[in-house]
């Protein structure tokens, strides 16, 4: 537990070095909100094979906030995928989700993963 806490703290500290502390924290909270919005949209849409798009979109939106958003998106994505893999989700699907996460965080268009026919609302 101490190791995990130390890693999170160091990640936070490294992210803060790029800008002001309050700016970073604000970006992180806004990025977490972007991730939550993508998750709720994914659940609302219930679209078959749409999860990669929502992963990429949530990470993309969060990353647009700045370094704090990138940090939040990475931590949330990693935690979610680790949790799902631990509880029996396939390794290949987890890796595909992580690729979509990285795609979005890098600033690439999340529509690359958009499934055909998904309503324009999303």
From Swiss-Prot:
<dbReference type="InterPro" id="IPR000096">
    <property type="entry name" value="Serum_amyloid_A"/>
</dbReference>
<keyword id="KW-0345">HDL</keyword>
<keyword id="KW-0732">Signal</keyword>
<comment type="subunit">
    <text>Apolipoprotein of the HDL complex.</text>
</comment>
<dbReference type="Pfam" id="PF00277">
    <property type="entry name" value="SAA"/>
</dbReference>
<keyword id="KW-0034">Amyloid</keyword>
<feature type="region of interest" description="Disordered">
    <location>
        <begin position="89"/>
        <end position="122"/>
    </location>
</feature>
<comment type="function">
    <text>Major acute phase reactant.</text>
</comment>
<comment type="similarity">
    <text>Belongs to the SAA family.</text>
</comment>
<keyword id="KW-0964">Secreted</keyword>
<feature type="compositionally biased region" description="Basic and acidic residues">
    <location>
        <begin position="89"/>
        <end position="108"/>
    </location>
</feature>
<dbReference type="GO" id="GO:0035634">
    <property type="term" value="P:response to stilbenoid"/>
</dbReference>
<protein>
    <recommendedName>
        <fullName>Serum amyloid A-2 protein</fullName>
    </recommendedName>
</protein>
<feature type="signal peptide">
    <location>
        <begin position="1"/>
        <end position="19"/>
    </location>
</feature>
<dbReference type="InterPro" id="IPR052464">
    <property type="entry name" value="Synovial_Prolif_Regulator"/>
</dbReference>
<dbReference type="GO" id="GO:0034364">
    <property type="term" value="C:high-density lipoprotein particle"/>
</dbReference>
<dbReference type="GO" id="GO:0006953">
    <property type="term" value="P:acute-phase response"/>
</dbReference>
<keyword id="KW-0011">Acute phase</keyword>
């Amino acid at each position: 537990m101490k190791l995990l806490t130390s890693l999170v703290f160091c990640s936070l500290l490294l992210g803060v070095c790029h800008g002001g502390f309050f700016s970073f924290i604000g970006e992180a909270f806004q990025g977490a909100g972007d991730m939550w919005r993508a998750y709720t949209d994914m659940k609302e849409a219930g679209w078959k094979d749409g999860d990669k798009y929502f992963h990429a979109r949530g990470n993309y939106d969060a990353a647009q906030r700045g370094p704090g958003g990138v940090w939040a998106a990475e931590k949330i994505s990693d935690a979610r995928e680790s949790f799902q893999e631990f509880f029996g989700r396939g390794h290949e699907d987890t890796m595909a989700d992580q690729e979509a996460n990285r795609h979005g965080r890098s600033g690439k268009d999340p529509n690359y993963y958009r499934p055909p026919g998904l309503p324009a609302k999303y």
